[in-house]
Amino acid sequence: MGRKLNRIKAALADKDKTNKWLAEQLGKDSATISKWCTNASQPSLETLLLIAKILNMEVNDLVRLEAVND
């Protein structure tokens, strides 16, 4: 079993972009972007696809599957 975690924070750093910049691009609150970047919450699949498009990346580069050890 695993849980999906996003790599939005790393992707923004790679592109030299900020949470505020992404919030403006998406029309979202910067607090929402912050929650996504810390994986406190996750964007919808539709939003994740839009983020990938905005950052000119593949959506696969924004998602990782991390195993949970019991």
Give residue ranges: language-model regions.
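A short, Lys/Arg-rich alpha-helix, primarily the initiator
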Residues: M1-T18
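The alpha-helix within a helix-turn-helix
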Residues: L12, A23, A52
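Residue-level detection of the helix-turn-helix DNA-binding "recognition helix"
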Residues: A13, G27, T38-A40, A67
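Short alpha-helical DNA-recognition segment
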Residues: D16-K35
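Residue-level signal for the short linker/turn that defines the boundary of a DNA-recognition helix
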Residues: K17, P43-E46
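DNA major-groove recognition helix of helix-turn-helix
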Residues: C37, L55, V63-E66
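DNA major-groove recognition helix of helix-turn-helix/homeodomain DNA-binding modules
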Residues: E46-D61
